[in-house]
Regions:
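Conserved ABC ATPase "signature" region
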Residues: 6-24
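Hydrophobic anchor residue at the start of the ABC signature
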Residues: 43
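Catalytic Walker B motif of ABC-type/P-loop ATPase nucleotide-binding domains
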Residues: 54-57
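Helix N-cap at the start of a conserved alpha-helix in ABC-type nucleotide-binding domains
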Residues: 65-67
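Conserved catalytic motifs of ABC-family nucleotide-binding domains
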Residues: 50
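Conserved catalytic loops of ABC-family nucleotide-binding domains
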Residues: 74-87, 95
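Conserved ABC ATPase signature
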Residues: 29-33, 37-39
Length: 135
């Protein structure tokens, strides 16, 4: 984390932990956190300095469904605020939260479509959009 004094850095860190639902766990050691909580700490670290581009590789893999919804809502909010968010996932219901779906196989692009036009993702889009609106 760069910029500002120690108190400013701590404040930004606390805000990032709050955004991922871990504000109450700030004094816990890594060994006291579950796998999903560690995943959320990693997400908090990634958003801490407000990057223009956020690349998240399977960001919801260790999360329960409720926390997955919260984190995808956070990513949607970051995107609405002007950040580019790139999600790597094997889950069609997670991909449905995205604007575009790029399918790869052995490093080659098979398709690049709006989520609504991707046959495997499109059935999940209405529910994903409804969850995003609620988040």
């Amino acid at each position: 984390m760069t910029g500002g004094g120690a108190s400013a850095r701590r404040k930004r860190a606390l805000e990032a932990l709050e955004q991922v639902g871990l504000g109450g766990r700030v004094d816990h050691r890594p060994s006291q956190l579950s796998g999903g909580q560690k995943q959320r700490v990693a997400i908090a670290r990634a958003i801490l300095n407000n990057p223009r581009i956020l690349m998240a590789d399977e960001p919801t893999g260790n999360l329960d469904s409720a926390t997955t919804t919260e984190i995808l809502g956070l990513f949607s909010a970051l995107h609405r605020a002007g950040q580019t968010v790139i999600l790597v996932t094997h889950e069609n219901d997670v991909a449905a939260h995205c604007q575009r779906v790029v399918r790869l196989f052995d490093g080659r692009i098979l398709s690049d479509l709006p989520a609504e036009q991707d046959d495997e993702v499109a059935p999940h889009v209405p529910a994903a959009r409804a969850m995003g609106a609620a988040a």
